[in-house]
Every structure is written in C-alpha cells, then in structure tokens.
C-alpha cells in the first residue's frame, strides 16, 4: 500500500525590523483561518537579531552623501541566510521595481513559497539585492515608511489564491482583475434602503439577463487605470 506524499505547505518568510507587525491582518479572516489550518506557514525574522555589533546596528549613512540611512548588506545577508530554508523567490519591497498585480499574485501562488524583505530608512544596500538575486517589487507610485504594509498586502493577495483557502473557485474566477475585468456591483438585503432599490433585473430570477447585465458592468473601464 502506497502512502500519499505529504503536501508541501506554502511558506512565506519575512525579514523585517518590526516582527510584531506580523501576522497582523494576515492572522485574521480567510488568511488567518488558512494559517491555522496549515495551508500556509509564516516565518518572521527580526533583522536586528543579525546585527554584527553589540549595539544591534542595522543601518549606516550612504556613501556619496545624502539624507537618511541605508540598511547594511552584511546584516541583511545574515538574515537571509537564516531564512534560506524557505523556498521560492526572494523579493525586496521597494518603491521601484516591478509593479505588483493580480497576475503576479498568481505567479507567487504557484511557487512553493516566497521570502520578502521589508525595507526601511532610505532603502537597502544594492549589493545584497544583487548578491541574493532579489526581485524589487512595488505596490505603486507612492512611498511608505517601510515595507511591512506592502508585504502584508502582497501576502494577502497571494495566500487567498492557494488551494483550499477560498471555498468557491467560481468566486475566484469572478473577482476583479481576473481576465482583466472589474467585478460587477453587488447587492443584498434590504431590498430598498434609503429610497434606493436593488436593480429589478437581479430580482427577476432570469439568470440569462442577470449574466448579461453583470458582464456589461465587468467591461466598464476602471477609473484607476
């Protein structure tokens, strides 16, 4: 009798100066339940634990001058070495780099895991980014104080795509940005609220008409583009 090969748990490794930020909202709702059920695992490392001096120094002033401080490559390299057992791509959250989107989330969901580095200060020494072959990934054209919020957003979008996390595959297929379209508006009880009624077609029971109206909304352009 053959025993089934145990399923590899999708694992996220996070290197951060603020480990208490995790799991944060990832420990709640759908992602939190999936974490409790062992569908995915989270390993968080405090970058400061890998400092090379007794003062736990993790940053230094940039060569060439300029404002702010830069995360040291030696400290971050030691951190990444300690998390080398986590499989998958290495990603540095940064205002520059590839824009994270739904297609990217799907890519990561098909990986065995991912390691995320949460930047702080003025950024990370470029040498460790290159030496560790990290991908630089951005959530958009804006600046956050650090990469922790970006890391949580990236993981939330990815974890919900893992098998067994969302109960309805149809629900995933119909979400916004699948096939490049936006999700249609949703309505629930009460039927009339503050003088506003649910569209009559949704009350008709005619599934063909409902599908047609839904598709019309799907094809409307997003104002965020």
What are these regions (language model features)?
Residues 216-222:
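Conserved small/polar residues in nucleotide/adenosyl-binding loops
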Residues 71-120, 125-126:
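S-adenosyl-L-methionine/SAH cofactor-binding core of RNA-modifying enzymes
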Residues 124, 128-177:
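Structured adenosyl-cofactor binding patch, chiefly the S-adenosyl-L-methionine
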Residues 13-15, 43-45, 89-91, 114-115, ...:
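Hydrophobic/aromatic beta-strand patches that form the interior of the parallel beta-sheet core
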Residues 29-34, 106-110, 131-132:
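Short, solvent-exposed amphipathic alpha-helical segments in soluble enzyme
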Residues 160-200, 212:
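Surface-exposed, charge/polar-rich loops and edge strands
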Residues 2-83, 203, 208-211, 218:
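N-terminal nucleotide/polyanion-binding subdomain common to many enzyme families
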Residues 48-53, 98, 143-146:
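A short acidic, often aromatic-flanked loop/helix-cap motif at beta-alpha or helix-coil junctions
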